From Swiss-Prot:
The gene is APOO. Expressed in all tissues examined. Up-regulated in diabetic heart. Residues 1-25 form the signal peptide. Belongs to the apolipoprotein O/MICOS complex subunit Mic27 family. Component of the mitochondrial contact site and cristae organizing system (MICOS) complex, composed of at least MICOS10/MIC10, CHCHD3/MIC19, CHCHD6/MIC25, APOOL/MIC27, IMMT/MIC60, APOO/MIC23/MIC26 and MICOS13/MIC13. This complex was also known under the names MINOS or MitOS complex. he MICOS complex associates with mitochondrial outer membrane proteins SAMM50, MTX1 and MTX2 (together described as components of the mitochondrial outer membrane sorting assembly machinery (SAM) complex) and DNAJC11, mitochondrial inner membrane protein TMEM11 and with HSPA9. It is a single-pass membrane protein. It comes from the Eukaryota. The keyword Signal applies. This is MICOS complex subunit MIC26. It comes from Homo sapiens. GO terms for biological process: cristae formation; inner mitochondrial membrane organization; lipid transport. Keywords: Endoplasmic reticulum, Glycoprotein, Golgi apparatus, HDL, LDL, Lipid transport, Membrane, Mitochondrion, Mitochondrion inner membrane, Proteoglycan, Secreted, Signal, Transmembrane, Transmembrane helix, Transport, VLDL. Glycans are attached at S162. InterPro entries: MIC26/MIC27, MIC26/MIC27_animal.
Length: 198
């Protein structure tokens, strides 16, 4: 160990010594030709006479330019549609992932309840033979009844919200029908004199 330290300390201590070195002047030195910085080719500034001349477009460049101008409205429409549908798709994917996680960690008794609700929908589909209106009304109605047996509080909230929406839709429909009635049947030429007036 001592030998290793001795060998490493020796060269290290020599680096601490200082020496002065003097250069000997050349006896036959040529006369100095100093060059200015501006004269170096690296730093030369080009003349201000240059002019930009645009090259003529080739047939290929012209046709590509026309194609780009032709496709521009469609690409902007696609970009706008993509920017509008991207958040909706992300929320749909997130809803799917949340549903998958819920089904993986479902509460006890969830799948039998889901089976009963689905079976009620099938019974509604079987009873709705014939009319298309029955096929639209019976299956969701039976499924709603079965779901309300298992989830009564959620059924009450759903009934309240859907009742308000149905009332709003009915009111809007009434207003539209009233406006149409006034426009088509109560014009000045269509109004008949009542029997009491002459």
């Amino acid at each position: 160990m001592f030998k290793v330290i001795q060998r490493s300390v020796g060269p290290a201590s020599l680096s601490l010594l200082t020496f002065k070195v003097y250069a000997a002047p050349k006896k036959d030195s040529p006369p100095k030709n100093s060059v200015k910085v501006d004269e170096l080719s690296l730093y030369s500034v080009p003349e201000g006479q240059s002019k930009y001349v645009e090259e003529a477009r080739s047939q290929l460049e012209e046709s590509i330019s026309q194609l780009r101008h032709y496709c521009e409205p469609y690409t902007t429409w696609c970009q706008e549609t993509y920017s509008q549908t991207k958040p909706k798709m992300q929320s749909l994917v997130q809803w799917g992932l949340d549903s998958y996680d819920y089904l993986q960690n479902a509460p006890p008794g969830f799948f039998p309840r889901l089976g009963v609700i689905g079976f009620a929908g099938l019974i509604g589909l079987l009873l709705a033979r014939g009319s298309k209106i029955k096929k639209l009304v019976y299956p969701p109605g039976f499924m709603g009844l079965a779901a309300s047996l298992y989830y009564p509080q959620q059924a009450i909230v759903f009934a309240q919200v859907s009742g308000e929406r149905l009332y709003d839709w009915g009111l809007r429909g009434y207003i539209v029908i009233e406006d149409l009635w006034k426009e088509n049947f109560q014009k000045p030429g269509n109004v008949k004199n009542s029997p009491g007036t002459k």
